[in-house]
From Swiss-Prot:
Pathway where it operates: Lipid metabolism; fatty acid biosynthesis
Domain of life: Bacteria
Name listed for the protein in its UniProt record: Acyl carrier protein
Keywords attached to this entry: Cytoplasm, Fatty acid biosynthesis, Fatty acid metabolism, Lipid biosynthesis, Lipid metabolism, Phosphopantetheine, Phosphoprotein
Post-translational modification: 4'-phosphopantetheine is transferred from CoA to a specific serine of apo-ACP by AcpS. This modification is essential for activity because fatty acids are bound in thioester linkage to the sulfhydryl of the prosthetic group.
GO biological-process terms attached to the record: lipid A biosynthetic process
Length: 78
């Protein structure tokens, strides 16, 4: 598992209080992990802080799953 995946999972577990086993690549923040719209905004801000990347609102609106977040961060960090 990549460093990005591990760090993203840690942030999600800390912010949403979910079991790490539920945080899989295709897990939807809202449908599978119980996040609401405020949670998703807070996750995006936490990702930005942790990885030193900027996630524009247009991009944030396309990040629905754990895998979406990892892909965006990896691309933005490259």
């Amino acid at each position: 598992m990549s460093d990005t995946v591990e760090r993203v999972k840690k942030i999600i577990v800390e912010h949403l209080g979910v079991n790490a086993d539920k945080v899989v690549e295709d897990a939807s923040f809202i449908d599978d992990l119980g996040a609401d719209s405020l949670d998703t905004v807070e996750l995006v801000m936490a990702f930005e802080e942790e990885f030193g990347v900027e996630i524009p609102d247009e991009a944030a609106e396309t990040i629905f799953t754990v895998g979406d977040a990892v892909k965006f961060i990896d691309k933005a960090s490259a």
